[in-house]
């Protein structure tokens, strides 16, 4: 069973940064790795579900023409909206996934610290929706903490294995260590050097 919305509401009830995104070097380093893994300097339309308080969102915003974020916790949505006030092209919605997947096409979908909260059925549904909304050259980036989390139906390793199996896209970039998994899948298999005419 996927983790229910009240769990996330409680996390944000009296804490604007329940995972210490702003304080922990681990989190700052992970965001830097996430951004470095992206093979394009800029994207047309990015979707970041499970945006929490918008710390990663604020670093994705300068890299795209349109940014859509969402979260299931009302307080997180309010915090992310405040964090993104300086970006007119960014929008934050209150929605629960996979049921309330947005309309539109995206050339980048970022699943950061989200998918292990979903059970296998909901994750499968999310993958189907992601595939349907990715552009012909679209990419999907996944980033997850590897240690088991109490109450989560899946681990990072299970999530990334299922993503790799179900997406049917080439894994064009990855970073794995004992703490975190980062994977980028793309419908465009060309490397950064190939894009820039270096090879």
PLM features: residue spans?
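Class I (Rossmann-like) S-adenosyl-L-methionine-dependent methyltransferase catalytic domain
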Residues: 1-40, 45-49, 53-104, 118-132, ...
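Hydrophobic adenine-recognition pocket in adenosine-nucleotide-binding enzymes
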Residues: 114
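A conserved beta-strand element that flanks and buttresses the S-adenosyl-L-methionine
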Residues: 110
């Amino acid at each position: 069973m996927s983790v229910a919305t009240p769990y996330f509401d409680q996390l944000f009830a009296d804490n604007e940064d329940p995972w210490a995104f702003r304080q922990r070097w681990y989190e700052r380093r992970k965001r830097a790795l996430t951004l470095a893994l992206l093979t394009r300097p800029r994207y047309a339309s990015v979707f970041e579900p499970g945006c929490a308080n918008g710390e990663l969102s604020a670093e994705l915003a300068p890299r795209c023409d349109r940014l859509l974020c969402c979260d299931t916790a009302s307080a997180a949505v309010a915090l992310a909206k405040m964090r993104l006030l300086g970006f007119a092209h960014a929008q934050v919605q209150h929605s629960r996934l996979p049921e309330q997947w947005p309309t539109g096409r995206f050339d980048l979908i970022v699943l950061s610290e989200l998918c292990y909260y979903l059970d296998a059925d909901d994750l499968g549904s999310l993958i189907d929706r992601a595939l349907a909304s990715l552009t012909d050259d679209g990419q999907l980036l996944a980033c997850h903490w590897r240690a088991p989390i109490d109450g989560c139906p899946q681990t990072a390793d299970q999530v990334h294995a299922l993503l790799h199996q179900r997406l049917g896209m080439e894994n064009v970039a990855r970073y794995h260590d004992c703490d975190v998994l980062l994977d980028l899948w793309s419908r465009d298999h060309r490397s950064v050097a190939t894009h820039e005419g270096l090879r």
